[in-house]
């Protein structure tokens, strides 16, 4: 096993997240060892480098919406460390993201975004969290069961325990299975936006306006979902 001295969490993520994830600091270090071993054995992983923990760079205390994905896009050049998001340079959007944008325009009446970059959502308090934070290129689900689930489960539990306004958007069976981690958090649930399931309950589900209504019921400001 290729091992290295783990960096303190406060050096690799926002301080509130470092405190929230301290109970799984050892697991995060183990996942670092796992990724180094993958590289040592000639395999790569997505997203690259610091983007693995990118979801935890925005302030923990400012998260108002949790949007759960499964694992990163396996297509090289797509995964950026935020669930469903891609870099601004990606012109042909993944099918799930295209469907998210179709529902966004129908739900909110906004024009189609100019790119698939969801960074503005993250900066406004949407935690774009994949349940599994890495993947082998072109092999969807390849890092499931390797240890990331313990990390992201702790992230969800910590958010739910803050006692601050929060809404979870759970698309698909995998995301809905996380409901027991946050029994008191209002949730917007539907089918997954994947092309295989979007017509079975995702389209027409109005997740963005429903999330805002649930935020307002908690006395919080609605989320500004507009994208450039």
Swiss-Prot record:
GO biological process: base-excision repair, AP site formation via deaminated base removal
Main location: cytoplasm
Keywords from the named record: Cytoplasm, DNA damage, DNA repair, Hydrolase
Catalysed reactions, semicolon-separated: Hydrolyzes single-stranded DNA or mismatched double-stranded DNA and polynucleotides, releasing free uracil
One GO CC annotation: cytoplasm
PANTHER family: URACIL-DNA GLYCOSYLASE
Protein name, as recorded: Uracil-DNA glycosylase
The gene coding this protein: ung
